[in-house]
């Protein structure tokens, strides 16, 4: 039986989120609805999640000393990493000492903090199907990897980045240096290491939200949400929809792959497993041990959205992954580089039938920064996609003055 306390009292159940962007914000809201005392941590002040949490803290989360000091001072019951750029070795140390429980585990946080750890786990340890790949530390190594078998076209990504930053496709020799430079500029940390992957001519790509939660038997059980289809531009999610139609054999394979990788990572919580699909063939791409940006569509489609599923799972509560309605999401970009933007056209966006708008509250806008998302419901996915994109297009961020 799970016992939950009262926030801001000695009995409080305290959860600390490391990373407080738009995904963390929704997790915090879900936790608060269950009476959890929340601590939102980010590298800058007034991050979206900090605006709704009981406590807001700003530190360099990649600094192990700052991270250790904060966790020891706040004494949370759970620490929930929501981004990759965290001093994960310190989390492993604190978890091993019994200081705190890391979600899903400190090992999972370390392995998934960069593309190398998780790719080697999936392909080399678990034997899961992936694209051909090489890791490279220099432009010369990148060229040698391409010439040595990866070939063209191929995709280059920093080993550590988020939301597709630094990712590009190379169609021929003339694009190699530009791809390397772009990867160096887009990485989360300044070490020059990339993964280059052979290009898979897939039909579509999906996110399979996979939940490890306590079952009725008292044991951890794995459940799957309906597959989410999505469109990415330069590795950054632009729109998503649920459900994505799949051949039954492909769905079975996708679930088997997701089960294998999440079981190895262990712990409890929601995982976003990214997969490429061609006919009945499925390839593993990446996994995040936390809610996924493409999964924001579940705020329109599921009885329990991905954030509620994550909150319930990490607290040891039962979950329900049932689909409620077909739906879609479409990103609202900043469009301008400015502080404290205003949003025109929200009324026009909400006049599109069966739509909702979520504005994240980010204090600073960039042209390609995700500032909000439009959600739409419908009887079918195609109609929902049309509605979501139309609603998103009507929201117009602008600089003040």
Curated annotation (Swiss-Prot):
Disulfide links within the chain: none
Entry keyword set: ATP-binding, Ligase, Magnesium, Metal-binding, Nucleotide-binding, Purine biosynthesis
A Gene Ontology term for the protein's cellular component: cytosol
Superkingdom field: Bacteria
Reactions performed catalytically: N(1)-(5-phospho-beta-D-ribosyl)glycinamide + formate + ATP = N(2)-formyl-N(1)-(5-phospho-beta-D-ribosyl)glycinamide + ADP + phosphate + H(+)
Binding residues annotated for ATP, in chain numbering: 115, 157, 162-167, 197-200, 205
Sample GO molecular function, one term: phosphoribosylglycinamide formyltransferase activity
Ranges of residues in domain ATP-grasp: 120-315
Binding-site residues for Mg(2+), renumbered to this chain: 274, 286
Pfam families, per the entry: ATP-grasp, PurT_C, RS_preATP-grasp-like
Broad enzyme group: ligase
Pathway as given in its UniProt record: Purine metabolism; IMP biosynthesis via de novo pathway; N(2)-formyl-N(1)-(5-phospho-D-ribosyl)glycinamide from N(1)-(5-phospho-D-ribosyl)glycinamide (formate route): step 1/1
Alphabetical list of InterPro entries matching this protein: ATP-grasp (IPR011761), ATP-grasp_carboxylate-amine (IPR003135), ATP_grasp_subdomain_1 (IPR013815), PreATP-grasp_dom_sf (IPR016185), PurT (IPR005862), PurT/PurK_preATP-grasp (IPR054350), PurT_C (IPR048740), Rudment_hybrid_motif (IPR011054)
Family: Belongs to the PurK/PurT family.
Name this protein carries in UniProt: Formate-dependent phosphoribosylglycinamide formyltransferase
Organism: Cupriavidus necator (strain ATCC 17699 / DSM 428 / KCTC 22496 / NCIMB 10442 / H16 / Stanier 337) (Ralstonia eutropha)
Gene from which the chain derives: purT
């Amino acid at each position: 039986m799970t016992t939950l306390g009262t926030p801001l009292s000695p009995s409080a159940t305290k959860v600390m989120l490391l990373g407080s962007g738009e995904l963390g914000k929704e997790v915090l809201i879900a936790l608060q609805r269950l009476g959890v005392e929340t601590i939102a941590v980010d590298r800058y002040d007034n991050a979206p999640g900090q605006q709704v949490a009981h406590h807001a803290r700003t530190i360099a989360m990649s600094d192990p000393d700052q991270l250790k000091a904060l966790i020891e001072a706040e004494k949370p019951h759970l620490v929930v990493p929501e981004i990759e750029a965290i001093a994960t070795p310190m989390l492993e140390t604190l978890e091993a000492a019994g200081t705190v429980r890391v979600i899903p585990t400190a090992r999972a946080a370390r392995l998934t903090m960069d593309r190398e750890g998780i790719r080697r786990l999936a392909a080399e340890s678990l034997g899961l199907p992936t694209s051909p790949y090489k890791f490279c530390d220099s432009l010369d190594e990148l060229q040698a990897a391409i010439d040595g078998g990866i070939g063209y076209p191929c995709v280059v990504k920093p080993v550590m980045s988020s939301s597709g930053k630094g990712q590009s496709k190379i169609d021929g020799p003339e694009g190699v240096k530009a791809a390397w430079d772009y990867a160096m500029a887009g990485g989360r940390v300044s070490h020059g290491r990339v993964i280059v992957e052979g290009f898979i001519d897939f039909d579509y790509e999906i996110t399979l939200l996979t939940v490890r939660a306590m079952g009725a038997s008292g044991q951890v059980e794995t459940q799957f949400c309906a597959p989410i289809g999505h469109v990415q531009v330069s590795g950054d999610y632009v729109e998503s929809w649920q459900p994505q139609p799949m051949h039954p054999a492909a769905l079975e394979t996708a679930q088997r792959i997701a089960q294998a990788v999440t079981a190895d990572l262990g712990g409890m919580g929601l995982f976003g497993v990214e997969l490429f699909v061609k006919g009945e063939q499925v390839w593993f791409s990446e996994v995040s041990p936390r809610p996924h940006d493409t999964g924001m569509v579940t705020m329109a489609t599921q009885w329990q959205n991905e954030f509620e599923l994550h909150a319930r799972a990490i607290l040891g509560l039962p979950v329900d992954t049932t689909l409620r309605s077909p739906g879609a999401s479409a990103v609202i970009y900043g469009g301008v580089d400015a502080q404290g933007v205003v949003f025109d056209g929200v009324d026009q966006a909400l006049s599109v039938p069966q739509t909702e708008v979520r504005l994240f509250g980010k204090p600073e806008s960039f042209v390609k920064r995700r500032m909000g998302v439009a959600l739409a419901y419908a009887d079918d996915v195609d109609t929902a996609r049309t509605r979501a994109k139309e609603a998103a297009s009507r929201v117009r961020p602008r600089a003040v003055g």
